[in-house]
């Protein structure tokens, strides 16, 4: 066969067929519609030699991946539901031909086996995977606002049972090898070195027979194989899905309906319905927005933020053993695989940071993600003290001390005195201008802002903030480090609030205005949850800390003007020691680590009588419009480099609803004329803070959009 083909078929002397997958010119194997002709030639050869073949082994020639999924770019070419349905049907037919082969087929899996890759493997009789860390199996289509469209919704429940299949497909979670074996997704997990040998031996052990129908556990039979049991499962799943998605993600409901339809009407009807619903989802606004995030994330992986080669980073120093410092040290060791030296003014601070890391690693050990030896190996990469011992080896030092300008300037001086001349100093400030922190530095070209979000091990965004004389190499180095830490970095201009806090502040201020107008706290939070935010603004203030808000807002008012002046609630709350969760009381009451309910006494403190006057949409738009306005100002002032960066920063930094694609894509969807119209209406009703900025007015007048 042609070596330029993605699928290469060969035969060994024992009459086994081997189908190797190697998409030419690509790092990852993906399935593409253009491969259909190749696969038809493969099936023709296999059927022609059917009497001589004992079995077929499918494997990848890529060193670290099986099939990462279908090429999502194919969907962008679909102009109609009909075209998208034809695409899904083509994939289904190809995998059905694989399932219908008269001899057994085994998929030998190493590396990611996701989406269409797993659907191909599910069409095989058997599956063997490596136990390597790189091996992951899953159906993540729901993350793109889709459902598995090549048989996944029909084959997975029949293989492992309805309950575990619903969990995998609705969440899009990816399984490690041992978990996949435990659930029955694969038949064996083995060392990489023997993968192909074991795959072939499995066919021999099975007597070269096709797989018999899987026998599911008795509980699964009672629940999923009876009409009443199925109804109970799907009713419960629909209820949980609605609670989680609040109706904003149509793919989740479609997944439930397609799986239920297939179990009740049979495999053939289920596949037809799967293709139909898949196609409908492809054309939805939600899926298009989620796919735009996927493409943007992929693009950003190649973006170093500057035209320079990043310097190697073999060791990192962290100043401050608090929550931020501990989290930064964790992602550096766990994700970036780089050793860390922690410095704190007190031994207790260092011990707290080490203990924080140990607890996170131990959770992974308890979940069988790490062995005890691996946990110890990770902890051995962490050390610390109250002095600067070891900092002469650090290539990057990340500062996470208190938000005090003089203290941070002293940290710069200390590192310049105790580290290499080439050491980069990255400050994790959330509000102080980077040029001020660098103002007394001997080597200002090595200084850059690196703003993480709390908790660091969970929040995916980091803002990289160069000041006027930060070198391109410094920018490229910290962008590369942040990406290795598992973060999505965006490069933003050095100004008050940077980007994320600057667009968050007007949103939070308006939420406070709505509250002070008498809207009940729970109503206000629920309105933004329904809109698609992960938490409501009042809950967010409690989580971040009222004291943090009280520090940031005056800086923004001083630097950017009176539109950042919110209602005077911070001082009143802080006088009553209401800092939020950290102090055990804020707008909500807390018991241990759990939020309980609205603390009704806060109304009396703020001299309010709660009374609902606005509907949910009115509340949401009041909070959202100032954020959209400020995002446009940030773009026009060069705070962010593009609408893409602005959207990714909002989604990954503050949880802007992903199904809307970010503030800029959302404005494009609404139409800028409509956005201006809404802002003008709010200006008349609530004041000048809603007046649309010049950039919005100009674009709306010219009929422009933020994206082509």
Swiss-Prot record:
It comes from the Bacteria. Pathway: Lipid metabolism; fatty acid beta-oxidation. GO terms for biological process: fatty acid beta-oxidation. GO terms for molecular function: 3-hydroxybutyryl-CoA epimerase activity; enoyl-CoA hydratase activity; long-chain-3-hydroxyacyl-CoA dehydrogenase activity; NAD+ binding. Residues 311-708 are annotated as: 3-hydroxyacyl-CoA dehydrogenase. It catalyses: a (3S)-3-hydroxyacyl-CoA = a (2E)-enoyl-CoA + H2O; a 4-saturated-(3S)-3-hydroxyacyl-CoA = a (3E)-enoyl-CoA + H2O; a (3S)-3-hydroxyacyl-CoA + NAD(+) = a 3-oxoacyl-CoA + NADH + H(+); (3S)-3-hydroxybutanoyl-CoA = (3R)-3-hydroxybutanoyl-CoA. Keywords: Cytoplasm, Fatty acid metabolism, Isomerase, Lipid degradation, Lipid metabolism, Lyase, Multifunctional enzyme, NAD, Oxidoreductase. InterPro entries: 3-OHacyl-CoA_DH_CS, 3-OHacyl-CoA_DH_NAD-bd, 3HC_DH_C, 6-PGluconate_DH-like_C_sf, ClpP/crotonase-like_dom_sf, Enoyl-CoA_hyd/isom_CS, Enoyl-CoA_hydra/iso, FA_oxidation_alpha_subunit. Its main location: cytoplasm. The record marks 119, 141 as: Important for catalytic activity. Transmembrane segments: none annotated. One of its GO terms (cellular component) is cytoplasm. Residues 1-191 are annotated as: Enoyl-CoA hydratase. In the N-terminal section; belongs to the enoyl-CoA hydratase/isomerase family. In the central section; belongs to the 3-hydroxyacyl-CoA dehydrogenase family. Catalyzes the formation of a hydroxyacyl-CoA by addition of water on enoyl-CoA. Also exhibits 3-hydroxyacyl-CoA epimerase and 3-hydroxyacyl-CoA dehydrogenase activities. Heterotetramer of two alpha chains (FadJ) and two beta chains (FadI). This is Fatty acid oxidation complex subunit alpha. It comes from Vibrio cholerae serotype O1 (strain ATCC 39541 / Classical Ogawa 395 / O395). The lineage of its organism: Bacteria, Pseudomonadati, Pseudomonadota, Gammaproteobacteria, Vibrionales.
């Amino acid at each position: 066969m042609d070596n330029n083909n993605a699928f290469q078929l060969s035969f060994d002397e024992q009459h086994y067929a081997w189908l190797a997958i190697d998409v030419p010119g690509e790092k990852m194997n993906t399935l593409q519609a253009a491969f259909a002709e190749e696969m038809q030639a493969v099936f023709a050869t296999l059927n022609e030699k059917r009497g001589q073949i004992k079995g077929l082994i499918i494997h990848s020639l890529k060193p670290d991946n099986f099939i990462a999924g279908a090429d999502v770019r194919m969907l962008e070419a679909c102009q109609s539901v009909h075209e998208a349905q034809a695409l899904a049907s083509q994939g289904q037919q190809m995998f059905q031909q694989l399932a219908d082969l008269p001899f057994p087929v085994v998929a030998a899996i190493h590396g990611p086996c996701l989406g269409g890759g797993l659907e191909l493997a599910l069409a095989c009789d058997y599956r063997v995977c490596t136990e390597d860390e790189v091996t992951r199996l899953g159906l993540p289509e729901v993350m793109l606002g889709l459902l598995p469209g090549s048989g996944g919704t029909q084959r997975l429940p029949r293989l492992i049972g309805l309950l575990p299949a619903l969990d995998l497909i609705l969440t899009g979670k990816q399984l490690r090898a041992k978990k996949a074996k435990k659930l029955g997704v694969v038949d064996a997990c083995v060392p990489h070195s023997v993968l192909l040998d074991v795959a072939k031996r499995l066919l021999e052990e099975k007597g070269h027979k096709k797989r018999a129908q899987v026998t599911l556990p008795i509980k699964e039979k009672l629940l999923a194989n009876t009409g009443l049991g199925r109804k109970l499962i799907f009713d419960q799943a629909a209820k949980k899905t609605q609670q989680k998605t609040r109706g904003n993600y149509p793919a989740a409901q479609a997944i439930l309906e397609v799986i239920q339809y297939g179990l009740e009407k049979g495999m053939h009807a289920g596949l037809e319905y799967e293709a139909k619903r898949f196609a409908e989802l492809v054309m939805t606004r939600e899926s298009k927005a989620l796919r735009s995030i996927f493409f943007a994330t992929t693009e950003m992986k190649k973006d170093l933020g500057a035209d320079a080669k990043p310097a190697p980073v073999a060791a990192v120093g962290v100043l401050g053993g608090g929550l931020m410092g501990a989290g930064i040290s964790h992602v550096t060791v766990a994700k970036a695989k780089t050793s860390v030296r922690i410095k704190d003014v007190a031994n207790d601070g260092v011990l707290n940071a080490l203990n924080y890391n140990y607890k996170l690693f131990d959770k992974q050990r308890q979940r069988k993600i790490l062995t005890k030896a691996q946990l110890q190996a990770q902890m051995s990469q962490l050390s610390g003290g109250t002095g600067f011992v070891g900092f002469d080896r650090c290539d990057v030092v990340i500062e996470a001390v208190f938000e005090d300008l003089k203290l941070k300037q002293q940290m710069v001086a200390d590192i310049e005195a105790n580290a290499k001349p080439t050491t980069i100093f990255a400050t994790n400030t959330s509000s102080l201008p980077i040029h001020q922190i660098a103002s007394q530095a001997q080597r200002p070209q090595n200084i850059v802002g690196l703003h993480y979000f709390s908790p660091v091990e969970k929040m995916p965004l980091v803002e990289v903030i160069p000041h006027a004389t930060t070198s391109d190499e410094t920018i490229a180095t910290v962008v590369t480090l942040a990406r290795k830490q598992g973060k999505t970095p965006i490069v933003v201009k050095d100004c008050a609030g940077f980007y994320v806090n600057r667009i968050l502040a007007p949103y939070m201020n308006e939420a406070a205005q709505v509250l002070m107008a008498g809207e009940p706290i729970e109503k206000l939070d629920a309105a933004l949850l329904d809109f698609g935010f992960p938490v409501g603004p009042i809950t967010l203030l409690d989580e971040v800390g009222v004291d943090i808000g009280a520090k940031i807002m005056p800086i923004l008012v001083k630097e950017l003007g009176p539109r950042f002046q919110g209602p005077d609630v911070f001082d009143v709350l802080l006088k009553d020691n209401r800092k939020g969760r950290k102090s055990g009381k804020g707008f909500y009451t807390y018991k241990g680590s759990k939020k309980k309910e609205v603390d009704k006494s806060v109304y009396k403190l703020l001299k309010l009588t709660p009374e609902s006057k606005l509907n949910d949409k009115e509340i949401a738009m009041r909070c959202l419009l100032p954020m959209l306005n400020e995002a446009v100002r940030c773009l026009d002032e060069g705070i962010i480099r593009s609408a893409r960066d602005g959207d990714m920063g909002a989604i990954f930094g503050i949880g802007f609803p992903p199904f809307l694609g970010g503030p800029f894509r959302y404005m494009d969807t609404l139409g800028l004329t409509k956005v201006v119209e809404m802002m003008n209406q709010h200006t008349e009703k609530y004041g000048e803070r809603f007046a649309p900025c010049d950039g919005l007015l100009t674009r709306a007048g010219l009929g422009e959009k933020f994206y082509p």
